Every structure is written in structure tokens, then in C-alpha cells.
A protein has these predicted regions:
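Small-residue-centered hinge/linker elements
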Residues: 2-247, 252-255, 284-389, 393, ...
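Amphipathic alpha-helical
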Residues: 276-278, 282
Length: 484
């Protein structure tokens, strides 16, 4: 009986494996056929992708994890991959191949790379940096970088570019290398867990967090050497790519750590502060070429030029509806539920602005707010839309803080009697877990030479200087809010 039961279970598992494989295969083929059809439609705003003939600049969006080896991917990852337009995993050898293809296309006059948050080690990032340097050397084509929040990794990569642009009101976070650890020594003892570590070698510290409440002297020495070495490599590479920056200037930037975009220009860390549409206009004018998303370039490069049809019929006029729903985030991820990121809604705003059959726009706002910087990016695009077409906002249950911010460019704003709106201000929170050690035996450790290191150490209370710094940032954001 037991044998028969196991056999039945095995047959059921085999059945589901086969069904799952076939389902994935047919769905993948369906997606492939959809992407191979004559026109590609965005799922929300039905944006069609015309063939762009003539000189072009390629717009890439990079945000995700860097890999030096090809990770396991599902059939969906393979079918839906856009090659260089990455918001997930970066596989360096593939990127090198795709960049070579762009370099060999005489119509491609340069790259405009929009950087998001990059995950991965500096070694892999350095390899990607070398790939971009080789692209420039081989093709003599420029690379321009634009980002909102720049950090050490994105800035390090962007330093090989011909220009580095940053959105207004954002911050450059040059924290440099740091070590941040949590220690569970006392916590595990209180739980009745006794751990013995057997090691050979002074600097074998992998299990210290499970037996101690703080790093050993050997570990601190090792962390110091690590930080010095990595920081020295960063400064050397940045100095070579950005000759206008002295070693002292870079040391100061890493010490200051949090730098306003406008201050970054004054310090010659970046080229210019601008919204993306301003950067687009600048480079299109300079190169006499049109900016095209890489994903659109891939879909259309082998097609004959066709006029892009509108979602509306040729003689049909209409009003576009844009939905701004959810918490406003800085994420590039369009798939996050109950969130509103600038990248997805800006695509819809561009469609509504550029489609000649769209005569007006209604935007439904149901958002409690969120990121001030992301709200500002949306606000700017809506401001430009309102210069060309009537824009009306209809507020739902809530349009507070950032939700009100993005509503401001509208010619008319309508709210229900029960709509919760307003909340014009800026709020932030500082949490510390210094009492965790006494209550739970959990300790936090952060090792860095940044002047702002306490802000990132969960085991310490923020200093008065840090609180004053954050208050100044909050006041500036508030002033920008009410001025718009």
C-alpha cells in the first residue's frame, strides 16, 4: 500500500511538472508572438512604438543587481529581457555584446544612461565600468549619465561618462565603503543557544556575530584596512575619470557624504542639475538626433518606417485618463502593488502630451503621498503637459502630501466632500535600536569614516548635529513644496 501511495504521488508530481512546462512554453510563445507583432502597445496607455529613422541617441535605464556569471532565469526572464534596458539582473558579458552592437550602428550617436539603485560588489561594477570605457575608446561615442539619488556605486559608474546630470532637489550620497553588522551574542545565550567556534587564523571572523556583541580587535583592524584599500581605489579611479577633482576634493566629498545636487555642481562632482526632459532636449539639440529607449530600438530596428497610429482612431478626438494611485516611491519597479513610481506614470504623461488626438487630460489621484523627490519628478512632467493641454485633477479618497503636490500643476482640481487632502509639509523619522542590547542582547556595529556615519548606525541615537542637518534638508524640501 505504501509503495502504491508513493507511486501515485510520483505520478501526480510528474503530471504537474509536464503541465507547468507546457503552460510556460505556450505562454512564452504567446508573449514572443505579441512582441513580434507589427505594433507594440504599453499595457496601460497603449503607447505604440514607431520606427525611428536617422540619427539617434539610445536611452538606457539601469537598476538592479550586477552579476559576473549568468544566473538561473525562468523562461519569462529570457522572453521579456530587453538586453541592455535592465531593471533586474545585469550579466556583464551580455551587456558587452549588446554595447558592441550599438557601437557598430552608425545611426547611434551616443548613449544616455538613466541610473537607479545598483546592487553588487565593486569588483563587478568596476568590470562594467571598464566595458563602458572600452565602448567610448572603440567607438568615440559619448556616454551621458542622469540619476535622481546618486550613491557611491552609481557615481563611480557614472564617472566614466562625458557628463553627469542629476535631478533637482536630490542628494548625492557618497558614503564610501563601510562595514555594517548586527551581533546576536547575548540574544542567543538568552534563548539558550550556545555556540562554539573553532577556527584557525586570527582574521577568521565569519561567526563573530553569533558569539560576540561587538567585533574583535582583529576584525576592526581588518575593516580599517578594507575601507582604506577600497577608498583608495575609488579615489584613484575617480581622479583619472574626473580630472577636475583633486584628491582633497574627493576626500572631502566622502567625509561630507550627503551632498545636495546644487552643491554637487559647485564642487564639480557633477556637470549639471536638470530634469530628464531638459537633459533629453539638451543632447538631442547638440547631436541633432532623437532619443530612443533601448527597448524600442530593439523592437523596431529591423522594421520599415511606419507612421505611429494613435490609440484613438485617426479622426477621433478624446480625453486621456491617467491614474495616479498608491504610495509614491522612488522605485523603478512597475510591478509593485499599491505604489506609484515616476517612471511608469511619466510614460503615460508623455503619451497624453504627444498624441495629437488627445485634447485634454483627466488625472485621478488617490495617493497618500510618499517620496518628495519622486513627487517632484511627476510634478515637473505634469507642469509641461499643462502648458500644452488642459489638465484636470479628480481626487479620490485621499490626495495628501505628495498626492497634493502632483495635483498642483492642474488647471482645475476637483475633490469629493469626503476626500482627505492637504497635508502640506515634510515629515521624516529617525529610529534607533540602542535598547535592543539591554532587552534582547542584539548589538549593532557600523565602521566608517563618514561624518554622517551615526545616521546609518541603528545602534546609536542621532547626534544633535545630524538632527540639525536633517531639519535643514526637511525645511528646504518644504520650501520647494510650497513654492510650487
Amino acid at each position: 500500500m505504501a509503495f502504491l501511495f508513493k507511486k501515485i504521488i510520483r505520478l501526480i508530481k510528474t503530471y504537474f511538472i509536464i503541465v507547468g512546462f507546457l503552460t510556460t512554453l505556450f505562454l512564452s510563445l504567446g508573449i514572443f508572438l505579441l512582441l513580434s507583432s507589427e505594433h507594440y502597445f504599453d499595457s496601460k496607455s497603449f503607447i505604440t512604438v514607431p520606427h525611428l529613422k536617422g540619427d539617434k541617441l539610445i536611452h538606457l535605464r539601469w537598476s538592479g543587481t550586477l552579476h559576473d556569471s549568468q544566473t538561473e532565469s525562468s523562461p519569462f526572464d529570457i522572453v521579456l529581457s530587453n538586453g541592455l534596458d535592465l531593471e533586474g539582473d545585469f550579466y556583464i558579458p551580455h551587456m558587452e555584446t549588446y554595447l558592441k552592437e550599438l557601437g557598430d550602428d552608425h545611426e547611434v550617436k551616443g548613449l544616455v544612461i538613466e541610473l537607479g539603485h545598483l546592487e553588487g560588489g565593486l569588483a563587478v561594477l568596476s568590470e562594467l565600468r571598464d566595458v563602458l570605457k572600452n565602448f567610448k575608446k572603440r567607438t568615440q561615442k559619448p556616454i551621458y549619465f542622469w540619476f535622481t539619488h546618486g550613491d557611491t556605486k552609481s557615481y563611480y559608474l557614472a564617472s566614466v561618462g562625458d557628463e553627469i546630470l542629476m535631478a533637482p532637489g536630490h542628494k548625492l550620497l557618497l558614503l564610501g565603503p563601510m562595514v555594517n553588522s548586527i551581533y546576536f551574542g547575548d540574544a542567543l545565550k538568552r534563548l539558550g543557544v550556545n555556540i562554539e567556534v573553532l577556527k584557525t587564523g586570527t582574521y577568521k571572523s565569519a561567526f563573530e556575530p553569533f558569539v560576540s556583541n561587538e567585533p574583535s580587535e582583529a576584525s576592526i583592524f581588518m575593516y580599517d584596512e578594507f575601507i582604506k584599500s577600497v577608498k583608495e581605489n575609488l579615489i584613484q579611479d575617480l581622479s583619472q575619470s574626473l580630472p577636475q577633482l583633486t584628491r582633497d576634493a574627493l576626500e572631502k566629498a566622502f567625509k561630507t557624504s550627503i551632498i545636495e545636487s546644487e552643491e554637487a555642481v559647485k564642487a564639480h562632482l557633477i556637470t549639471q542639475v536638470s530634469y530628464f526632459h531638459e537633459a533629453k532636449s539638451k543632447y538631442e539639440t547638440f547631436h541633432k538626433a532623437k532619443l530612443q529607449r533601448y527597448s524600442d530600438y530593439v523592437l523596431t530596428k529591423s522594421r520599415k518606417q511606419k507612421e505611429s497610429p494613435s490609440y484613438l482612431e485617426e479622426d477621433e478626438k478624446g480625453i486621456a485618463l491617467i491614474e495616479a494611485i498608491g504610495t509614491i516611491t522612488d522605485s523603478f519597479d512597475d510591478s509593485m502593488d499599491q505604489s506609484l513610481n515616476p517612471h511608469s506614470i511619466i510614460k503615460e504623461i508623455h503619451w497624453a502630451k504627444e498624441d495629437k488626438n488627445v485634447k485634454a487630460v483627466v488625472m485621478r489621484v488617490n495617493s497618500p503621498g510618499g517620496s518628495a523627490t519622486a513627487s517632484d519628478l511627476i510634478w515637473e512632467e505634469l507642469r509641461l503637459l499643462a502648458l500644452e493641454k488642459p489638465l484636470v485633477v479628480s481626487m479620490g479618497d485621499v490626495a495628501a502630501s505628495g498626492g497634493y503636490y502632483i495635483s498642483a500643476p492642474a488647471h482645475k482640481i476637483f475633490a469629493n466632500a469626503n476626500t482627505i487632502t492637504g497635508s502640506i509639509g515634510v515629515i521624516s523619522m529617525i529610529a534607533n535600536f540602542k535598547n535592543f542590547k539591554e532587552k534582547y542582547g542584539i548589538s549593532f556595529f557600523l565602521h566608517s569614516d563618514s561624518d554622517r556615519k551615526d545616521l546609518f548606525d541603528m545602534g546609536k541615537e542621532a547626534s544633535e548635529a545630524d538632527k540639525e542637518f536633517l531639519k535643514m534638508q526637511s525645511d528646504k524640501t518644504y520650501h520647494d513644496f510650497i513654492s510650487k
